[in-house]
Amino acid sequence: SVNVYMLPFIRPSDVRRRFPDDDTESFDSAFKAAVSHLNVNENERNIILAHQFITGAAAGGSESVSVGGLDNISAEVFEPFDYAALGHIHHRQNITSEKVRYCGTPLKYSFSEVNDKKTVTIANIGKKGELSIEEVPLCPIRDLREIKGTYLEITDRNFYDKFNREDYIHVTLTDEN
């Protein structure tokens, strides 16, 4: 069997209301307190789904992050788990190893993500401690595209023949006329 735990985005005030005797002054301490109350059996296979900003993650620009990293939590809190499937960051990435991973979003939400290749992450959990990750590429019906050109170029219908006309575009004019 595999135990699956889910924690939403947690603020210190959320944990303080539920566990008033725990240290919950920071996001990190609040998340650690919440995990400690899950009673994880480390001899079994454990997966956690969480929506937090982990120290060391690279934000892509379209996510909301706090000034100074106040809402960061340490990746060490995931040590009792065989896999941590994380949300909050739009770009797929491993944090300390493939066992602590942001899968990224399936769609691009901002032009800061225009060059991202979106995927679905498949995590295969074998025996205790065995993990393999597979990424399946996604091909959106409509993509985000950045184009540059003069006013005359971008207003010429033929300019768009080389693109999917259904894509969402961000246009940069290279002239002032």
Language model features: what each stretch is:
Residues 1-177:
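Extended recognition/assembly regions associated with phosphoester-bond processing machinery
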